[in-house]
A protein has these predicted regions:
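Short Pro-Gly-centered beta-turn/loop motif in secreted/extracellular proteins
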Residues: 64-72, 288-294, 659-685, 743-758, ...
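Post-signal-peptide, soluble extracytosolic/periplasmic N-terminal scaffold domains
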Residues: 2-16, 24-248, 544-615, 623
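A short, amphipathic beta-strand motif
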Residues: 50, 256, 632-636, 711-720
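Short, acidic Ser/Thr/Gly-rich low-complexity loop/linker segments typical of extracellular
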Residues: 649-658, 735-746
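Extracellular beta-sheet/turn segments enriched in Thr/Pro/Gly and aliphatic residues
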Residues: 110-114, 317-323, 689-709, 773-794
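Short, ordered, surface-exposed loop/turn motifs in non-cytosolic proteins
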Residues: 41-48, 56-61, 638-648, 721-734
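Feature captures outer-membrane beta-barrel proteins of Gram-negative bacteria and organelles
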Residues: 134-136, 160-172, 193-207, 348-362, ...
């Protein structure tokens, strides 16, 4: 074998040489040369975080390193905030940007760009979280609000009346109708009997753009210098109350520049309003806390080294303005309503009205108003102007032509408010021939000069001034002057002072002077709380007509979840007999009852009242308290007597069918509804115990807390020697979650079947098996089984 091997070696060498020569012939496939190190490093693509002037943009972008330079797409640079005039199109070689310094942080995988300061625009930083829009919930149902009232006055007689509101609501909107019926008793024939309809209205809301459609009996929109009228027709307009998350007036914005990451604290009029974090670069603080009037904002910035800089910035905020670009207004078309509250269907001539407001800038809001009828044309314009930090001026002018008479109205005013004092004035001047829809359908009566008697006042002037004196209380003064076209004047001067005393007690002093009569009305009142729900008051009053009186009053308020309330009062009157008053009230979740008496000796009036609502929803009929706006129905899946809380206040328990109606709900506010599960059976399983939702206006919604019964039990597990299985042992079941053995061998098992094979693994790895058989539990009580013997080797 050794000889053979030596003989094969030359042949093998020849074969290898031939083969090698054959593989190297031209035209045959060949392996590529090994890459050079320089070629490998010429180009590489990284996913890097982009940082501008120490500010982390939050962007992770592809960056190409080619021949020692960094390339990035222009779109990514623009997204990061670089100005377009400095960014070439396409792929950008950062080295070509002569004013940009580039640094690659390989450890943190970041690309650091240092830019000129004038390249970076101010970043808008919300100071506080913007209140999110809450999607309103709504259901389908109907309700009947009612108010039954009756009284009887000695020597005069009595009457009974029933007020109602019938309302239907669904996903499209709501329909409501209100009215009352009255019946007079013997001796009280002076008041109208029968049924009187008030309003019948279809309401459709759009919360996304804060607009409403109304059809039926509507009220026209008005500005501060115009009048509203009742009409039968349609109305469309903006309604910002549908969006409580919106701030419609301009709030101050504070701008600056931070060289390094910085925290900023805001103090408004000496009180800390909050804080936020700032990244390096120019910034603009927005979404500041709600403030009003004049004041000073102090910004205190603190950098990473603890260095602080304080800046004081004055401001003036008023809700009379609209934000820039924001508009408000409404249009109403129909027929003027006549004899409201007297006749059911009495409509006059056709008419139309429209108002509009627009925020031109943060310091200027323009207003416009127009009215029209067959013999009326009215147009007007106004402005609201902020004078820097020195208050707000409003002006308006209207011109009308009604039944051949021309007239104008001009109004102007000024308001200024701070935390220490406020001042306001408002003035109106009118021509005799000025008219609008409020006068258009009035009975036309002329005086001896052939002038219509029904008209507005010629001049109106109002002045008010208030001071906050700190521990010495608050004082206020107001003067109102009205002059008619026949030169009759009404001039009133009002003065007031109030101050908090010990605890929550307070004192109030007020005086009013009629300039034409030359007399004063004076009142002094002392309020003293007596516990959580009780209070007492002492009042001294002197009037020109009634003389002097001294009044004592005691009040007990009703708990939020129902109960009793009462009020007692007595007054000594110098020009008449003593006055006495007593009221007793009681309320539960179904109804509110009140009754009492008031008056003087031999002239007492006794009265009683029952208020509530009847609601149909989710196939259930409910008796509830009066529902002024929205409501919810709590459902606990048929479980009775479950306590319910609304905004952390107890409001009652579910009925026998597992329902509770909560009537005092504010529309569009995301309120909290919570149930107390302590009294539920132990085998009850819940997905949630609290929900926070908002309800649409004039609507109701079913707030459901789904529950299901689950077979649960405790089991005691022992070994064959009668000893409890070790703590921490794992109890396994097929298609079920593992359970853990606690002290005394007790394990809590859920989702049980009739027969449940158990496998137990102790902490040392030993295994044993047992079988748990569960019986019926119709009362859903917590049951404990065992001890069961867990045997090895089964």
């Amino acid at each position: 074998m050794a000889v053979a091997s030596r003989q094969l070696k030359p042949a093998m060498m020849m074969l290898l040489c031939v083969s090698t020569t054959a593989w190297g012939d031209p035209g045959d496939d060949s392996l590529p040369p090994p890459p050079q190190a320089q070629a490998v490093n010429d180009e590489a693509v990284f996913q890097l975080a982009l940082v501008l002037n120490h500010y982390d943009t939050g962007l992770v972008v592809p960056v190409t390193q080619r021949n020692g330079a960094f390339f990035i797409s222009s779109a990514d640079l623009l997204r990061a905030g670089l100005p377009p005039e400095h960014v070439p199109a396409g792929e950008v070689n950062l080295a070509s940007l002569s004013q940009v310094r580039v640094e690659y942080d390989s450890a943190a995988q970041r690309l650091l760009l240092t830019l000129p300061r004038d390249w970076i625009t101010a970043r808008v930083t919300p100071f506080s979280a913007q209140t999110a829009q809450s999607k309103p919930h709504y259901g389908r149902g109907a309700l009947l609000n009612y108010d039954l009232y009756t009284n009887h006055t000695e020597h005069i007689g009595g009457q009974a009346s029933l007020w109602h509101e019938l309302r239907y609501f669904d996903e499209n909107g709501s329909f409501s109708s209100t009215g009352y019926a009255r019946k007079n008793f013997t001796g009280n024939d002076g008041q109208q009997e029968g049924y009187v309809r008030y309003d019948t209205t279809l309401l459709i809301t759009n919360e996304d753009d804060a607009t409403t459609w109304s059809a039926g009996d509507v009220i026209s929109d008005a500005l501060s210098w115009t009048s509203s009228v009742r009409m039968g027709g349609i109305s469309y307009g903006r309604d910002f109350s549908l969006r409580p998350d919106l701030v419609t007036w301009p709030l101050p914005e504070f701008s600056g520049e931070a060289a390094v990451p910085t925290s900023v604290d805001l103090f408004i009029n000496g009180y800390r309003s909050g804080s936020t974090q700032l990244q390096p670069g120019p910034f603009t603080l927005t979404n500041l806390p709600y403030i009003n009037g004049a004041g000073d904002a102090v910004l205190v910035t603190t950098d990473a080294l603890g260095r602080q800089v304080s800046t004081t910035l004055p401001f003036y905020v008023t809700s009379d303005l609209l934000k820039t670009g924001l508009s408000d207004g409404a249009v109403t078309l129909g027929s003027l309503r006549r004899n409201y509250g007297i006749r059911n269907f009495d409509y006059g001539p056709a008419a139309g009205s429209g108002s509009y407001r627009y925020g031109v800038t943060d310091w200027l809001t323009l207003e416009g108003h127009a009215e029209g009828a067959e013999e009326l044309a009215l147009g007007g314009a106004g402005t609201v102007i902020k004078l820097g930090r020195f208050g707000v001026v409003n002006t308006a002018y209207s011109q009308s032509r009604m039944r051949g008479d021309n007239g104008g109205q001009i109004s102007w005013g000024y308001q200024y408010s701070t935390s220490e004092f406020s001042v306001a004035t408002q003035h109106t001047r009118r021509d005799r021939g000025f008219g609008n829809l409020a006068l258009y359908d009035q009975p036309t009566v002329y005086d001896e000069n052939d002038r219509p008697v029904a008209s507005f006042s010629r001049n109106t002037d109002q002045y008010s001034l208030t001071f906050n004196l700190g521990q010495y209380g608050n004082i206020g003064a107001a003067w109102i002057g009205v002059e008619s076209f026949d030169s009759q004047k009404t001039e009133l001067l009002n003065l007031s002072w109030s101050r908090n005393l010990w605890g929550a007690s307070s004192i109030y002093l007020a005086g009013s002077r009629d300039q034409q009569r030359g007399d004063w009305t004076v009142a002094l009142s002392l309020q003293v709380p007596l516990g959580e729900r009780d209070s007492a008051a002492v009042t001294f009053e002197n009037t020109p007509d009634a003389g002097s009186s001294q009044r004592l009053n005691y009040n007990h308020s009703m708990p939020s979840d129902g109960g009793f309330s009462w009020n007692m009062a007595w007054a000594n009157q110098s020009k008449s007999s003593d006055y006495q008053q007593g009221t007793l009230g009681w309320r539960n979740n179904n109804i509110e009852l009140q009754g009492g008496g008031y008056g003087e000796r031999d002239m007492m009036t006794w009265w009683g009242e029952a208020m509530g609502a009847i609601v149909l929803m989710d196939g259930e009929l409910f008796a509830a308290n009066k529902i002024n706006d929205a409501f919810v129905v709590i459902s606990t899946d048929g479980h009775p007597d479950v306590p319910v809380s609304y905004e952390n206040q107890p409001v009652g328990k579910t009925n026998n069918n597992g329902y509770l109606l909560v009537s005092g709900v504010s529309a569009y506010y995301p309120a909290s509804y919570r149930i107390d599960t302590l009294n539920l059976p132990a085998d009850t399983r819940l997905k949630e115990t609290e929900r926070r939702i908002a309800i649409r206006r004039h609507s109701g919604y079913l707030v459901d807390f789904p529950m299901e019964q689950e077979r649960v039990a405790s089991v005691i597990l022992h070994d064959v020697h009668g000893q409890a299985l070790p703590v921490g042992s794992q109890v396994r079941r097929v298609s079920r979650k593992n359970a853990v053995v606690g002290y005394d061998g007790i394990a809590w098992l859920e989702n049980l079947s009739d027969v449940n094979p158990l496998e137990v693994i102790s902490p040392d790895g030993k295994r044993c098996k047992a079988t748990l058989t569960v019986g019926a539990n119709p009362e859903h009580k917590l049951q404990t089984y065992g001890p069961l013997v867990c045997r090895e080797g089964l």
